[in-house]
């Protein structure tokens, strides 16, 4: 589904990615793990169209999307849940969710969008209770739920998640990742960039370890979780 080949990118004038190559198959969750500054967010920005690579190709569903705009990538089926959540604070929960479905609300296909509301409220029942509440008044965990739900309202073919555990309490992180695993069981294709290596490897079926803008190790998630170097560097055991 997604194929990245020899991806290079610069951030603030310095090269941040040095030739990344990886794939995400349809219906699979893949994780990018590594310390802060490893290149995870830069990779996500390139994939979502927010940052233009300096070299390399990004292919999605057989089409070269390397130079497509963010809007064109959303239209193609790629949706990003950004680092830091970035909900629309002055808008209600429902209005935030409608923003995720704007491409279908604009032609007034409300019947299909209604089913999506039911889907995300089933995943995140707390949001149903807060549909009229301003997003800025939600807790950090509720805002992360909203950010994921908003992305799902676009019916993505590939869901990109950048550091979904950042700044959240451990119990909230546990709930968020339980929902991500549920999405994986439903066959939702996901690419997860995450510093919480333990949770990422429990959720994904395959992982890539990033360091200094390079992929330094790649294997199935179970193998990576058992690697001594990965445990020492990222799992704290």
Region spans (language model):
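Helix-to-loop junction immediately C-terminal to a conserved catalytic motif
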Residues: 48
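ABC ATPase C-loop
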Residues: 151-152
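Conserved ABC transporter NBD signature motif
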Residues: 56-64, 76, 111-117, 219
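Conserved catalytic motifs of ABC-family nucleotide-binding domains
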Residues: 155
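The feature captures the beta-strand-to-loop junction immediately N-terminal to the Walker
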Residues: 33-35
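ABC-type ATPase nucleotide-binding domains, specifically the catalytic core motifs of the NBD
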Residues: 12, 68, 93-112, 123-125, ...
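Conserved ABC ATPase signature
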Residues: 134-138, 142
């Amino acid at each position: 589904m997604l194929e990245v080949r020899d991806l290079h990118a610069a951030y603030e004038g310095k090269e941040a990615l040095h030739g990344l190559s990886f794939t995400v198959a349809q219906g699979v969750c893949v994780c990018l793990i590594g310390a802060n500054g490893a290149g995870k967010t830069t990779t996500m920005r390139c994939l979502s169209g927010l940052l233009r690579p300096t070299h390399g190709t990004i292919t999605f569903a057989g089409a070269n999307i390397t130079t497509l705009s963010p809007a064109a990538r959303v239209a193609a089926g790629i949706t990003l849940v950004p680092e830091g959540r970035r909900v629309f604070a002055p808008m209600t929960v429902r209005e935030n969710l409608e923003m995720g479905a704007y491409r279908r609300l604009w032609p007034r296909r409300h019947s299909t969008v209604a089913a999506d509301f039911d889907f995300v409220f089933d995943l995140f029942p707390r949001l149903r209770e807060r549909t009229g509440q301003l997003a800025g008044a939600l807790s950090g965990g509720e805002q992360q739920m909203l950010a994921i739900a908003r992305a799902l309202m676009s019916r993505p073919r590939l869901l990109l998640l950048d550091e979904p555990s950042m700044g959240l309490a451990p119990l909230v992180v546990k709930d968020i990742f339980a929902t991500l695993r549920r999405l994986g069981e439903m066959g939702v294709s996901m690419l997860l960039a995450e510093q919480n290596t333990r949770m990422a490897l429990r959720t994904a079926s395959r992982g890539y370890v990033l360091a200094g803008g390079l992929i330094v190790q790649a294997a199935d998630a179970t193998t990576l979780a058992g690697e001594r170097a990965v445990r020492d560097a990222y799992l704290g055991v």
